C-alpha cells in the first residue's frame, strides 16, 4: 500500500507535534546547539480589520503549528530538550468574549486533542519561563519578530534567535505519514473541484463563475481555506503566470488554465489543469498540450530520492525545445538552443517547489540572484530527499511581454520562427501540475486529477 493511502484512517490519530519538536531539537543540537535548550514559539495574534471592529482573516503561523498542531490564535508553546516536555498555552476564558463567541477550548480539552504533554493558560507563560537551576544555564530558542513584548527570557543564560526558524524550515521538507495524509486529502477534495469546473466550463460566461464552482466544491467538503488565490485564466490570460483577476468574459477562447488547490488543516494542495473550454482543442493548443504533458510525465518518471532537481528542470527544457522544434516555433539545434536559454522565453518559471504547510514550502534553497536565467526562479536547488513533496508543473506560454524582447535580440531571434509563432499567441498558456511524493525508489503521485486528453475532453463535454 502507498504511504498514507488510507488517509482517513491515518488522520484518526493526532498531528505528530511531539515528533516534530524532537526532530527540530535534534537538528539544532546536531548543528552545535545547546542540549539543555528550550524552544519558544507563539501563535498568530487575532487581529481586527483596520478602522473597524471586524476580525481579519486568520492564518496560523506555520512554525507554531508544526510543533503544536494547534490552530488557536494568541497561543504559545515551549519544548524543553532535556525533559522532552511539550507545553501548550492557550487563552483563558474571557467572560465578555463568551457572550459573543461561546466558551473557548479548555486546557483539559486541548491536552486530549493535541500531541502535547501539558496545557496551561497564557497567564502562566512567564512563570513557566521563570528561572530554575536548569534554565539558568541553558539557551532559549525563538524566532525574531515573533516574541510578544510582555514575554521575558531573563532567566535563560543565552538567547538564540537565529537557529530555530532555519531548523523548522529544513525539518518541514520531509513529511510524516500524517502530513502526507493531509496532503492526499487536500488533493482528493481539490480534484473533485477541478472536475466540477471542467463540467461547468462550456456553459460559463465569465472566469469568476468557474472560480465560484471551485470554491463551492471545496467548502461543501469542509475545506474552507484555499492554499493560495486561484488562477482561472481563459485564453491569452493563461500566459500570465500568476493571473488572479479571474473576471474576464469567456467568449471564443479555446483553453482554460485552472491553477487551484484547497488546504486541509494547514496543509496545501497545488494543482493545475489546462483544458478546452468547449471540449475540443485547436490544432495549435493540442500540439502544445501534448508537449507539456510529455514534459511532465518524463520529469515525474525521472524522480527518486537523491536526484538533483536542477537536472530535472534541465530535462523539462530539453523536452520543450524538442517539441517546439518539431512544431517549427523554434529552429536550429537542441543543444545550441538550450545553451542560448531561448526556451526560457516559453517556459520562464521553475519546474516546481516543495509543498506542505505553505504552497511554496520552506527548505528549497532558491537562488533568485542566479545570473543564469534558466535557474533564477527555480525554487528548489539541490537533491531531493525521500518523503519530500514537490510539485512538477512544466508549462509553455505565449506571453508577448516575455517573448518579444527575444525577437529583438540578435542572439535569440535566430532560433525563433516568427511566422510560425504568430499562429500560437491565442493558445495563451498550458501548465499541468501534480503533487509528487518522493520515495527511495521513485515516486507516489498524490494528485488523482484527470489530465489525459481523452479524460479531460470527455469531462468537459459531459457538463
From Swiss-Prot:
Q: Which residues cross the membrane?
A: none
Please give the positions of the paired cysteines in each disulfide bond: none
One Pfam family matching this protein: AMP_N
Specify the domain of life of the species encoding this protein: Eukaryota
Binding site residues for Mn(2+) 1: 270, 393, 433
Annotated residues that bind Mn(2+) 2 are located at 259, 270, 433
Q: Which catalysed reactions does the entry list for this protein?
A: Release of any N-terminal amino acid, including proline, that is linked to proline, even from a dipeptide or tripeptide
A single GO BP? proteolysis
Q: What cofactor does its activity depend on?
A: Mn(2+)
Give the similarity note: Belongs to the peptidase M24B family.
Biological role stated in the UniProt entry: Catalyzes the removal of a penultimate prolyl residue from the N-termini of peptides.
Q: What is this protein called?
A: Probable Xaa-Pro aminopeptidase PEPP
Q: Which organism is it from?
A: Phaeosphaeria nodorum (strain SN15 / ATCC MYA-4574 / FGSC 10173)
Q: What is the lineage of its organism?
A: Eukaryota, Fungi, Dikarya, Ascomycota, Pezizomycotina
Per UniProt, what is the name of the gene that codes for the protein in this document? PEPP
